[in-house]
């Protein structure tokens, strides 16, 4: 998912008339027509990420219920219907719930915006160094796992003042990674594991 979206955005960014010598960082919003293409690509990324996480939640919910169904059948020859309910209403409520005031869609949107900024910074560095789209794509894969490398290169290419502004805008908050990819992976794991525990807990109430 990240590789495909990265390649699309990098190819799009390479078509901009970005001038690193102005001291400004690359921004998709600097070109209105191409900005719409970037927005469409990011929207597709958000939808796919949401679908992956939602599918994982649903799969784990049913896995927990199937496990409990098996146990009930082993213990009782004719279990009551109420013991075999998969509580689909509770699943829908779980998917709609908010965490720290944000629902799943809003949290995915935040990850996508962080990813967009990550690509913009990578393009700023890559274009300033004359790197090809393929080179920048490889760089992005490294930065997604080691975001501090990206910040060091921003500092080296654009100076400490620009780095300071970037760091302020990019500060994700306590308990949040600087990497969109790492945040997406953690959110997926947390949501899917929570779905299993919630489904299991409801069955035993």
What are these regions (language model features)?
Residues 1-174:
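N-terminal leader/targeting and assembly helices and adjacent pre-domain segments
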